[in-house]
């Protein structure tokens, strides 16, 4: 794990490249009606992370509760993974899109969202968030070395 390779004197990151690759279209689920953004299910994200990086550490650091009722409405998660020989920790918040009227179910949904958002910060499924502005996979692709990606201003 963590194999780095060099091309033209530049260190390239094989695992980061693998994480940045777009998911096949048939693995991407359409957003429910009235919701924004297609998605890749949690188990697929988990399998890909294990396939590319091996075991990882995942922790729900804190449950976020609604002030008046105390119901779980989100969570703060932390994901630690070794990528190309470097230990990387990312954090993100996951919310409860549809209240399940049960703290356990709400925590499970929030954890799933938090985990996927953490994985996105490592490149997994990032193309779904970035849309047409996604370029990371091409930038990291060893075949694309020498080609410059023209960045657009926001």
How should each PLM-predicted stretch be described?
Residues 1-17, 24, 136-154:
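Interfaces that engage single-stranded nucleic acids at replication/repair/recombination sites
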Residues 9-42:
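Contiguous, often N-terminal, cationic amphipathic patches that form binding interfaces
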Residues 40-144:
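Positively charged, aromatic-enriched nucleic acid-contacting surfaces
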């Amino acid at each position: 794990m963590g194999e780095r390779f060099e091309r033209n004197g530049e260190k390239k990151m094989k695992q980061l490249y693998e994480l940045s690759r777009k998911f096949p279209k048939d693995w991407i689920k359409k957003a429910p009606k009235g919701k924004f953004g297609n998605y890749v299910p949690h188990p697929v994200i988990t399998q890909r992370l294990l396939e590319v990086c091996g075991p990882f550490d995942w922790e729900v650091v804190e449950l976020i509760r609604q002030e008046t009722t105390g119901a779980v409405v989100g969570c703060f998660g932390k994901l630690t993974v070794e990528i190309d020989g470097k230990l990387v920790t990312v954090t993100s918040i996951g919310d409860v899109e549809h209240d399940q009227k049960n703290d356990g179910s709400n925590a499970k949904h929030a954890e799933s969202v938090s985990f996927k958002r953490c994985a996105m910060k490592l490149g997994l499924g990032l193309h779904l968030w970035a849309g047409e502005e996604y370029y990371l996979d091409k930038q990291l692709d060893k075949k694309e070395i020498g080609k410059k990606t023209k960045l657009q201003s926001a």
